[in-house]
Amino acid sequence: MRTGSNESAELMELLSAERQFSMYGPSHWAVIAVFVVGAGLLVWIGRRQTEAQARRLGRILAVLTAAIFGSVLIYSLFPPSIGRSVPLNLTDLATAAAVCAWWSQRHWAFALTYYWGLVLSTQALITPVLRGPDFPDYRFLGFWAIHVLVVWAAIYLTWGRRMRPRWRSYRFVVVVTLIWAAVTFTFNSIAGTDYGFLNTKLTTRSLLDIMGPWPVYLLTATTLVVIVWALMTWPWERIRRPAKQGPQPV
């Protein structure tokens, strides 16, 4: 009986290990496929909606995003831990901004979602920081639902509803991000945590691996993000100016 129990325990451990999420495994590719199809569908829908229809869809998706985000936050409290229960990761702020953007479609919320979602949240699709069970575990579902919905919000509002970032949007998001980084870095230093990976580099593979050791990667990443965000703003401003100026008198 003891031998059988040991064998059963070993089998359960093996099955559990096999169910762990694997980067670019079948479940990861499935998420990417759902993301691509959903993004295309949202753009198609967004371009054909009336204002009332867009408001209704936005509020439905805002409630969905908020419900999932709230569930994730509640889960992080059991048991409470200073290292994971405080919503200081940029993902937390991006999700809150996406909820506001879905619901209100206000420009400040759109700006945060556009820059944070399209550059930072998409990193979860490429190099997910997910250490845990694979589909259909609730941690897997919560992680991917949050990140996918944030990026979907940015895509829907930009290419579906045709909202556009401005240079003032760029400046606003840079300032907000720097304030978040300063507050979070200070909190990490006092509490011994690593929210935002500002005080210690990720242990899983990520783009930070090619940016040097700490604190070099912070400077490298900041410079790169600021440049990329500027490049994400410039084309829209180029398009907007001729339209605003209109035909010039001869």
Role assignments for model-derived ranges:
Residues 19-36, 171-175, 179, 190-230:
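Membrane-interface transmembrane-helix boundary segments in multi-pass integral membrane proteins
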Residues 46-58, 103-109, 160-170:
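Membrane-interface helix-boundary motifs at transmembrane edges
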Residues 75-85, 104-108, 129-141:
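Membrane-interface helix caps and helix-loop-helix hairpins in membrane proteins
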Residues 31-42, 93-103, 146-158, 217-234:
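Hydrophobic cores of alpha-helical transmembrane segments in multi-pass inner/ER membrane proteins
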Residues 126-177:
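A contiguous pocket-lining binding segment that forms or flanks enzyme active sites
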Residues 28-34, 80-92, 112-114:
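Structural signature of hydrophobic alpha-helical transmembrane segments
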Residues 55-61, 85-90, 110-118, 140:
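Cytoplasmic-side transmembrane-helix entry/capping segments in multi-pass membrane proteins
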Residues 65-74, 117-129, 177-188:
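Aromatic-anchored segments of alpha-helical transmembrane domains
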